Amino acid sequence: MPDATQFQFNVPSVPQAYDEFLRPRLFEPWATLLLDAVALRAGESVLDIATGPGTVARLAAVRVGPQGRVLAIDIAQPMLDIAKAKALLPGSADIDYQLSSATPLPSPSAAFDVALCQQGLQFFPDRIGALREMRRVLKPDGRVGIAVWVEIERNPLYAAYHAALRATVPTQLADLITAPFSWPSGSSLKSAAAEAGFRAIHLLTRSLPMVLEAGVEQAVQTFAGTPVAPGVAELPREVQNTLFARMRQELTKLVKDGRVVADWTSNIIVGQA
């Protein structure tokens, strides 16, 4: 998880809801796409930055296999606790989980074939510094794969949450939900990677659907996995009730055949050290 939201993800209820609702329906499909983009191969060494509950790391460990190596870092200990509690997937490499920031990375130089960061870089206070650290720890011609969401308006589940929040709670709290979408420019992301020294950089923009099969109530439960949820829990009960009533109204707009269906769109860059 990203540095700027560490304190929210250190509230245990948030990582638990994140892992239950968001990981399987959102982050695992995107992790598969990211691993495809970097063409991860058997036997390679991988660094996963802002691993959260280990989503990318676990799938990467299967791809590199027992002869590969995976180091996964995060700054939120409750997220790492969830990741460490999971059994390895069949045929995977061991995963070394470490509590660490992205600047500096806990690795010697030229140690990895691939560095990955799924939906973390936009939160880091020193984005260029984090990119330079990724390049430092990569072997010559090593590969980087980074995914960053586009505008919140093109990610309608969180747009629905934001609309409900803006209508019912203080603006400062409401706008925390926009943090994952704070670096929507693909060209800016690509330029930052070039400034950090990466080359042969390719930019992809992809969309994938997220389906909450149990509908609106499940989508409301999913909100508990966002870093805004602890702040909402501190509001007066009547304010919370008003918020969730408005949230149900907004989420109803996304219902198809009883399910909440929302596309998510992200920029992805792949480059070489």
What do these predicted ranges mean?
Residues T103-V114:
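A short acidic, Gly/Pro-enriched loop at the edge of an enzyme's catalytic core
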Residues I128-G129, R135-E213:
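Conserved catalytic/acceptor-binding region of the Class I
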Residues V64, A87, L165, A193, ...:
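Conserved hydrophobic residues forming the short capping helix/wall of the S-adenosyl-L-methionine
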Residues D3-Q8, P15, F27, P53-T55, ...:
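Conserved Class I S-adenosyl-L-methionine
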Residues M1-E44, T55-L59, M79-I82, K86-P90, ...:
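Conserved class I S-adenosyl-L-methionine
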Residues D113-R127, V150:
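A short SAM/SAH-binding and catalytic strip from SAM-dependent methyltransferases
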Residues S45-L105, G129:
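Class I SAM-dependent methyltransferase SAM/SAH-binding core
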